[in-house]
Amino acid sequence: TDAYWQKLVSFCQVREDRRDQAALATDLLRDRGHRDPAYFALMDTLLGFDKAKISTLPSITPLQFAMLQAAKLPLPPDAAESAKPALLRAVAQSEGTDLAVRLTAAEQAVAANALDPAILGKLYLQGGTAWTAAARPGAEGVSAETAAERAALFRSARTATERVPRAAALKQLFDAAARNGVLRPVAEISMPLMRDLRPAAHLSFFAPQAVRAAVSADEPAVAAEWFRIALREAPGNPLAARGAAEVWPLMMLAAPDTAWSDQLFRTWWEQQLERDAARAAERAAAFLALLEALDTRVPAQAWSLLPPSTPQRGQAVPALRDLRTAAEKRRRGETLLRTAVATKANPDRTPESARLHAIVTALRTAGFGAQARSFAVDAAVGLGI
């Protein structure tokens, strides 16, 4: 907008020490009733007036970030909550910024593929020691809902010398990361710890989290090792049996050699009903649709367990017709472009199962087999399958 460019020019003017021009343009914006309290406060600071006190800025813009840096003011704690990927990357790499804010930004930036996971790993190792005695790894009530708490938990897992404490810490860490939508970034930097932690029967309590993390980090072989432990311990161990059923759908999607099991599907379906009955059918339909899109045969009785009104596989949706056409004609670039659009936008409110089926099928048809499977896994994790 015109106001944005005026603000940008004014900031450049004050940086070039043309303060009178910047002050005049800022006053004109105020007189026109433009609403941007953070900008005006920061501009006043840069012009040498009152020092800004900004305690919250959840929708920070690149201009506001640059102004905060120029004014040598700290970023508010919530600055990384809704920022764009490029800005998240900048915040994560801003050495003068509070570590807690950088950690939050780094997690989100890695999740958006805008930052090397190794940078997140280095940030996780900063900031002192780990949990206090009241919040030790594996303790009840450890939530790790902030990036700083997850970093501390990661350090506890890394420094644990025994396998059970390390598994307990990683279990807490992966659960917290999944709740906060950052499982893939956390899993990627935790894979070295996972490889050192060899699967064993006495660690079966950790198997579901290990499988989910390994699948998220595109490590199906590691996931398969932990899944086998859960299956092996399932007879006579209700916790292991429940864990095996919980992550079996992810193994079906991530590892093509995983066998279909009517019993595991039925148990998983019952778990979904217990967990969130309102979304159970949506998740189950999406799982089955993704399987079929990956050319895995789904028994008819599996669909019959779902309510008759559940949207099923591949139903014709006008909005996805162009995607299918591009894939069938092997227009690979167009297929990827239309896939990106279909992933982000759903103006026709297409049922999730049909949309995912169309996207994965199109990717496979256009010759992107590996990418189709990765997309299916990411979609399943995102849906909470």
Positions of the model-derived regions?
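Alpha-helical solenoid repeat scaffolds
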Residues: 1-385
